[in-house]
Amino acid sequence: VRTVATSRNFTQGTHQETKNNLDVAINGNGFFEVNMPDGTIGYTRDGSFQVDAQGRLVTSSGLPVANGITIPQGTTSVNISADGAVSAIVAGNTQPQPLGNLAMSSFINSAGLEPVGQNLYKESAASGQPQQGTPGTNGLGYIRQGFLEASNVNVVEELVTMIQTQRAYEMNSKAIQTSDQMLAKLSQL
């Protein structure tokens, strides 16, 4: 017995509130775009962003978000709106300063994305071309600041399915074994 394939399930998980202004969850379809070290674009639903030493908005693994959003020094608060617009209030100012927009894409077949590790994916022939857009438009989900998306796996349901599969395998194995024994006895006659 060997694994033939594994599939990715990109249905939305529940949102858990973190109260961290740099955490964002996608409510609906879509992926955040990030700049990969090789210069290509990667895609993720993991919105646990942080600010690196250069002030860039980066993923938890240190990859900068596409569109090069930089948080100025002295920022007292960051706001990420439902449509992906990022703004900051810098010390000494009362008006928010626009910093850019989070880039998002969707795919005709997101199950065809190529996994590259650390919750990152690359486009492939199976996924189709990325369809970029503004969060909340053209079928893309909107953004919720201060939330992260939790797993979409129901552990209990998956455990029950695994046990059912194991039982079915055992029954088929017994049936084959019994059939083999019957053929052996028949050939002895």
Whereabouts are the PLM-identified features?
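Amphipathic alpha-helical polymerization modules
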Residues: 1-189
